[in-house]
Amino acid sequence: MSEKNAYAQSGVDVEAGYEVVERIKKHVARTERAGVMGALGGFGGMFDLSQTGVKEPVLISGTDGVGTKLMLAIKYDKHDTIGQDCVAMCVNDIIAAGAEPLYFLDYVATGKNEPAKLEQVVAGVAEGCVQASAALIGGETAEMPGMYGEDDYDLAGFAVGVAEKSQIIDGSKVKEGDILLGLASSGIHSNGYSLVRRVFADYTGDEVLPELEGKQLKDVLLEPTRIYVKAALPLIKEELVNGIAHITGGGFIENVPRMFADDLAAEIDEDKVPVLPIFKALEKYGDIKHEEMFEIFNMGVGLMLDVNPENVDRVKELLDEPVYEIGRIIKKADDSVVIK
């Protein structure tokens, strides 16, 4: 038998791999930005850092996946937004350190290469990159029969951004008396889905629960993670924020303390948190303790900003959206996050 047939009999479709590359080119082209060098398909993606105009550049990187939210995308056969989730999880992390995203790379592993489905996945990645103003400069699609089932795939990404050395956000400027502002999340985002899947294990996804304001359950569960780059970057450039917390796995309790020193704490006014309907539904149908919800989910706030009191009005002026004044920084007595 020929080498091609031998490989095909092992479960690897080389021709399908070539087709995927051709299908995704138009999506990758959407993400072009100044600084990108070379073309898709090289051994390494290239970026000219001098094109950023940053005087003292510091590169900041982040990598992440989308957890078991991917299993719901597979279950509901909807693959066009999960890529945006992957980009969001990476770029929101680096924006929290003050970085402007520059470029992104993705990795998709699957049991069977289905070009149409993988095109949808990468189209979602490209949409996320457009929203983050990051170039998709490379990636890998690995067909791994025996490792994954034919319908299964996994997705991960890697983002690199740049910050002016003097504008890095490391929490050192956060102090007692600072105000905590919350930016709304789009939904669950990409964390806590092992619990979400357990709560709704017996649901088809087509249900319209009374708490979800007329939306089908599957649409709410797969709502893509919001990307905060365009909202946060102008604030960073004007040096209006002392700290930023991306509210991901571990909710408020684990993520908010990551932006300040150990002798400080965050006091949160629960009544001012814009809790989304899906979280009320999860608490009800999952019989989850109310306080535990804040240890798992973003509860409607995907990004938290620490600002000086005198900068609050300017921040609200720059942000073309509702901004929630949900708390303040206090001296730590016991817990790092106090929800009142």
UniProtKB/Swiss-Prot annotation:
Molecular functions (GO terms): ATP binding; phosphoribosylamine-glycine ligase activity; phosphoribosylformylglycinamidine cyclo-ligase activity
The keyword Ubl conjugation appears for this protein: no
Family to which this protein belongs: Belongs to the AIR synthase family.
Keyword annotations from UniProtKB, A to Z: ATP-binding, Cytoplasm, Ligase, Nucleotide-binding, Purine biosynthesis
Protein name: Phosphoribosylformylglycinamidine cyclo-ligase
Pathway: Purine metabolism; IMP biosynthesis via de novo pathway; 5-amino-1-(5-phospho-D-ribosyl)imidazole from N(2)-formyl-N(1)-(5-phospho-D-ribosyl)glycinamide: step 2/2
Lineage: Bacteria, Bacillati, Bacillota, Bacilli, Lactobacillales
Cell location: Cytoplasm
Catalytic activity: 2-formamido-N(1)-(5-O-phospho-beta-D-ribosyl)acetamidine + ATP = 5-amino-1-(5-phospho-beta-D-ribosyl)imidazole + ADP + phosphate + H(+)
SS bond partners: none
GO cellular component: cytosol
NCBIfam families listed in its UniProt record: purM
GO BP terms, alphabetized: 'de novo' IMP biosynthetic process; adenine biosynthetic process
